[in-house]
Regions:
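C-terminal substrate-recognition "lid" of short-chain dehydrogenase/reductases
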Residues: 243-269
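Short, small/polar-rich loop/turn modules that mediate ligand/substrate recognition or access, typified
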Residues: 198-203, 265-267
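Residue(s) in the substrate-gating loop at a strand-loop-helix junction
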Residues: 163
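Active-site helix of classical SDR
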Residues: 142, 179, 187
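Conserved glycine-rich cofactor-binding loop
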Residues: 19, 26-27
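A glycine/serine/threonine-rich, flexible loop-to-helix segment
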Residues: 11, 56, 114-116, 198, ...
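Catalytic Tyr-X3-Lys loop
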Residues: 119-139, 159, 176, 183, ...
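Conserved glycine-rich Rossmann-like NAD(P)H-binding loop of the short-chain dehydrogenase/reductase
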Residues: 40-57
């Protein structure tokens, strides 16, 4: 832990011997989470709903780093599948130490374009977006995997994915923003509940990525001449570094939050 006068910095950030569950593992941000956990020494239960080929490519790129990365197909819209997957991980790995919930995104039809307004949208895609991001991407996995972590002697770490849109109005993405604001609030509430009532070493935090490309097709972000499209340009203009982030730039943050290096950090986004 961080309490000794002398410490091994490498050991402080190490996840050797631990098991991490990563949801949304076939996405760009989920892929960064898989890399982070594997490079830090954890075995990884990598959940995907689609994009198995991308996940297989990622696992091949990571190569042999002395850990097991096992893919599982899990539907984030199904609480029953998430619960069953928690049982599967316990069977296959014997325990859960880290959970990183990256599954989420906008459902088609849940956001309005420059030619529309919120009043032009159907209700169902907005409902599905909230279900995916708040429940399937956060609430249900926190319950399913968190229940398996309550008695861990060394505690554990749950890392949810919120978004900058939870705190800043981004044109068109109202349902998504509302869901991600819920993720941040849920994270804070769950952190207090788990630490006070179950295990003071069990921590819950969230990260709120800014402008990252994720798996968006290039034509959604760039014009044929390589310049940003208008929507992408607005995101870049609102970013102090004046560029999109690279998914691998999340690795350091995720390793910190997953490891003993952040043992006194909980309930933050």
């Amino acid at each position: 832990t961080c309490q000794e006068d002398e410490m091994d910095i490498h050991a402080l950030f190490s996840l050797e011997g631990k098991t991490a569950v990563v949801t949304g593992a076939s996405g760009a941000l989920g892929g960064a989470a898989v890399r982070a956990m594997a490079y830090a020494g954890a075995n990884v239960a990598a959940c995907y709903n689609s994009g198995r080929e991308r996940l297989d490519t990622l696992i091949s790129e990571i190569g042999d780093v002395g850990v097991e990365i096992k893919p599982y197909k899990v539907n984030s819209f199904s609480q029953d599948e998430i619960r069953q997957h928690a049982e599967d991980v316990m069977r296959d790995f014997g325990g859960i130490d880290v959970v990183i919930n990256t599954a989420g995104g906008n459902v088609k039809g849940a956001y309005y374009t420059d030619e529309q307004s919120l009043f032009d949208l159907d209700a169902q895609p907005q409902f599905d977006t909230v279900t995916l991001n708040l429940f399937g991407g956060c609430f249900w996995p926190c319950l399913a995997y968190g229940a398996k972590m309550l008695d861990n002697p060394g505690g554990g770490s749950i890392i949810n994915f919120s978004s900058i849109s939870a705190f800043t109005a981004i044109r068109g993405h109202i349902a998504y923003a509302a869901a991600k604001a819920g993720v941040s609030n849920f994270t804070q509430s769950l952190a207090a509940h788990l630490a006070r009532d179950f295990n003071p070493k069990l921590r819950v935090n969230a990260v709120a990525p800014g402008f990252f490309p994720n798996n968006n097709p290039a034509q959604m972000l760039f014009n044929p001449d390589g310049s940003y499209r208008a929507k992408a340009q607005r995101g870049v203009d609102a970013t102090p570094m004046h560029r999109m982030g690279h998914p691998n730039e999340l690795i350091g943050t995720l390793v910190w939050l997953a490891s003993d290096a952040s043992s006194y950090v909980t309930g933050i986004t």
